[in-house]
Design a protein with these regions (language model features):
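Short, well-ordered alpha-helical scaffold segments within catalytic/effector domains
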Residues: 3-4, 41, 67, 101
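Serine-esterase "nucleophile elbow" of acetyl-processing enzymes
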Residues: 17-63, 67-78
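Sec-dependent N-terminal signal peptides
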Residues: 3-12
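N-terminal secretory targeting signals
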Residues: 2-4, 18-19
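Single-residue recognition of alpha-helix boundary sites
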Residues: 13, 36-37, 133
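Alpha-helical cap/lid subdomain in secreted, periplasmic
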Residues: 46-47, 67-180
Length: 180
């Protein structure tokens, strides 16, 4: 996860010159199962004091929920960039691939209409949904990033999720040891 934060800092500092970053995410960014100050968004804010980081992540959030909240968040905070870390709960609930992709398309369109830089994070789901759904779900993110010509960040949980010492007992959420 430390490498993820270093890359994120580098990207927002040099590529888009972001001074205000909005994180639109779910429990992976909402510090689920730990104190807020132990989660990666808070730790990122501590490392980059010249930024304003707004963590609008909510545990259990879906792409539809994020889309519904986004207009008010954009109006209130007027971010330079928005990191989109959504879709995991859609996948865990078996939502239709087309619906998830349409919601992400709408989220990105809204961000662009508000003159902010969208950054999409790849999301993966556990294999128990079957290889077909899992592959189709994973393919959403590169397709959307390519369609809008935006940055696609790798899923920061890839190496964390395979180490049980870095995960909560639910096997889905990272614990405090996994934070940078």
């Amino acid at each position: 996860m430390r490498i993820f934060l270093i890359l994120l800092i580098g990207f927002f500092s040099q590529v888009c010159f972001a001074q205000k970053l909005l994180i639109l995410g779910d429990s992976l960014s909402a510090a689920y199962g730990m104190q807020q100050q132990q989660g990666w968004p808070h730790l990122l804010q501590q490392q980059q004091e010249d930024w304003q980081l707004i963590n609008a992540s909510i545990s259990g959030e879906t792409t539809a929920g994020g889309l519904a909240r986004l207009p008010a968040l954009l109006k209130q905070h007027q971010p330079d960039a928005v990191l989109i870390e959504l879709g995991g709960n859609d996948g865990l609930r078996g939502f239709a691939i087309d619906t998830v992709q349409a919601n992400l398309n709408s989220i990105i369109s809204l961000i662009l209409q508000n003159n902010a830089v969208p950054v999409l994070m790849q999301i993966r789901i556990p294999p128990n949904y079957g290889p077909r759904y899992g592959q189709q779900f994973s393919a959403i993110y590169p397709a959307v990033a390519e369609q809008f010509q935006i940055t696609l960040w790798p899923f920061f949980m890839d190496k964390i999720a395979v180490d049980s010492e870095l995960m909560l007992q639910d096997g889905i959420h990272p614990n405090t040891k996994a934070q940078p």
